[in-house]
Amino acid sequence: MKRTLLVTLALACAAPGFAHAQRIAPMKAGNFARLCTRATSAGICDAYIGGLTDGVSLSKINDRNEGDPSAPAGFCVPTTETMPVMRSKVLAWLKAHSETLDKPVGESVFAALHASYPCSVKK
């Protein structure tokens, strides 16, 4: 009985580690770049970039609609920036960093936005 309790407790303590796994889109950055260069799919590309941008911005907000304003931001896109400009910056970054084209799209687009829209560091 004591052994069963210890095993159950050990499994319960280990379980939260599995809860942090997140789904990663299977699309590669190279396929995304090809999609973004077609006029017929520019809207899909813009929606993905906008969704990633929103997700990063909203990731500081918890389930009580509270956030940590001191948490570092991954990138800072000005509110006046247009989606076509954002798309062109992401595509230019991907073109300049061809080693990332086999990586997951989210990782590469995040890196492109991070490089293209750095945040001011407050001292």
Label for each model-derived stretch:
Residues 5, 79-81, 105:
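Solvent-exposed, flexible loop/coil residues
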Residues 15-21:
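Sec/Tat signal peptide C-region and signal peptidase I cleavage site
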Residues 8-9, 47, 112:
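Residue-level signal for well-ordered alpha-helical scaffold segments within enzymatic catalytic domains
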Residues 4-13:
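Sec-dependent N-terminal signal peptides
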